[in-house]
């Protein structure tokens, strides 16, 4: 596998930014065999949480080792604490993730597949909410969405935030992102994640498959239950929604385990 750190200028963000890229490579190293798809690489867009940056998945998990035998390309962007939304008082991170970055990467990496069925978007915590936000707003671009320990989504913060001991910090972040410190007041608006789940199912016939995993001791567990209920109340399960839970709090032990389980569902076998 090739590991790349890419610095470039984003027109949408109007500033320089960074991504980490794991590139498939047919190779045999000590303790690791790599695989490369013959024609094009399937892509995992892997999103970080609120306190992290583009390097976090590479530093806290063995994502390169997990992707190697699958011939899977992994792209890890950086979006500060934006929740992957076009911020009211900040950069347009949604436009960057959903449009600008894929176009840039397609030019830089010609073997990167642009097929919907070959593009997966996943993340932890804020990144799980971001995967849902970006994926559900673009069901024609992503075949699968993976949410791990999703918590930072409107209008569900009241279910856990007061237990976190960081209420002031989240209020300030919300002002930058939404233009209001009270994200619960956004129920029924364009930012309402439950409304987005329902509206996307009504408006589109082709939908991404949803993989959702949550730790049973995670303080954000009640948020996961509301999201789960919303998906399961849609007749016919058009998202093919799949929910899993297991022991764990809001930590990397859980995310490292469950990103592997998600990759197993992709049934990728790599190239020859």
Where are these predicted regions, by residue range?
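Non-catalytic cap/lid and distal C-terminal segments of serine-dependent acyl enzymes
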Residues: 1-272
